[in-house]
């Protein structure tokens, strides 16, 4: 199985092809992208020096271009390892990361600050990060290395963001294909220099990638290669109305919530941002009520009801309370097995299943 057993966590130590993926991706980058970085530094520095004593260009504007040159030099110094670095932001402090995202931020029908500076310095736009590290340069399904091959080798079968949908690989005309999207955790519109970085790629379902996450800034969110909701202590919980619903005392409406109380502020903020960016509160709040009700009824209610219906057939045997309890336990274990496998294999709704069972102190 893959490394997505915990909701939103990708454990690369459990991805058997990870070293092969890193090797192939770094070789592709070194051949196709890296040579252009050297050229970009040379061309940008030349225009920067030409404008160094231009009084019409402010110090602030010169500083923006200078810091972009410094970033490219850092990237160049990593050679083929840049796109497979775990530490995506080098040793940059938060202020520098915020500065880079600010000058590179692209909005509809509006140039970024960096684009404006390129115009002022008369620097060719092909050296802008959106073009230099363009995701479009990474083939979809052609060539020796492409997105579909990467996704297939990762073998992640369930969306790490929501853990609700399968993302499957398949073959078509002897070619590997997948139903997954390859999402950029740090969006291309804010961090274009990370558009080709392996540790910025998150295999995801189309709903999480397109409808919810989009290009929202995720800098202060749960980063799937490092942590999960479980790691930070966030749990699914139900509202108390579910008890009345299961007992059949009244037809109540209950909700599924994500509880993260009593956590430190930094972790709280990460969880809040992740829930908001992915719309997890919306998709889980009521969408899986029937699943939760069936889960609890199957384990807590139906085995006993089933046994009661068998009493007439096994009347003498079932008068022994000890034997009766053993039979009930046996039935419950049979019912639990599919849920146990769901949790162990990281199948859709695995975390939801485990958290709700924990909430009701049901051992699985």
Where in this protein do the model-derived segments appear?
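C-terminal, charged low-complexity interaction regions
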Residues: 2-63, 67-68, 255-364
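Cys/His-enriched microdomains
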Residues: 157, 199-203
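Extended, Lys/Arg-enriched charged tracts that mediate electrostatic binding to polyanionic substrates
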Residues: 154-160, 167
């Amino acid at each position: 199985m893959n490394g997505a057993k915990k909701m939103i966590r990708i454990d690369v130590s459990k991805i058997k092809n990870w070293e092969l993926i890193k090797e192939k991706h770094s070789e592709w980058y070194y051949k196709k992208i890296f040579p252009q970085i050297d050229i970009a530094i040379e061309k940008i520095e030349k225009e920067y020096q030409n404008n160094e004593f231009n009084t019409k260009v402010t110090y602030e504007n010169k500083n923006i271009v200078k810091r972009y040159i410094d970033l490219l030099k850092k990237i160049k110094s990593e050679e083929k390892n840049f796109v497979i670095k775990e530490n995506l932001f080098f040793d940059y402090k938060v202020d520098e990361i915020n500065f880079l995202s600010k000058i590179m931020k692209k909005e509809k029908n509006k140039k970024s600050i960096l684009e404006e500076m390129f115009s002022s310095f008369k620097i060719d736009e092909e050296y802008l990060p959106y073009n230099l590290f363009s995701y479009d340069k990474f083939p979809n399904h052609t060539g020796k290395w492409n997105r579909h091959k990467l996704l297939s080798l990762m073998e992640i079968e369930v969306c790490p963001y929501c853990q609700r949908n399968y993302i499957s690989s398949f073959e078509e005309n002897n070619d590997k294909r997948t139903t997954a999207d390859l999402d950029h955790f740090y969006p291309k519109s804010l961090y274009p220099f990370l558009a080709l970085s392996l540790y910025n790629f998150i295999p995801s379902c189309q709903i999480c990638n397109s409808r919810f996450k989009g290009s929202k800034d995720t800098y202060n969110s749960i980063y799937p290669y490092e942590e999960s909701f479980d790691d930070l202590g966030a749990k699914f919980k139900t509202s108390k109305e579910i008890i009345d619903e299961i007992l059949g005392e009244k037809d109540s409406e209950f909700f599924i919530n994500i509880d993260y109380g009593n956590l430190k502020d930094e972790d709280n903020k990460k969880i809040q941002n992740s829930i908001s960016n992915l719309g997890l509160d919306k998709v889980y709040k009521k969408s899986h009520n029937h699943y939760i009700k069936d889960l609890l009824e199957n384990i807590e209610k139906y085995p006993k009801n089933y046994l009661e219906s068998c009493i007439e057939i096994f009347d003498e045997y079932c008068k022994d309370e000890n034997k009766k309890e053993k039979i009930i336990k046996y039935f419950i274990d049979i019912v639990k097995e599919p849920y146990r496998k769901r949790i162990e294999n990281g199948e859709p709704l695995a975390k939801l299943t485990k958290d709700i069972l924990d909430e009701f102190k049901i051992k699985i």
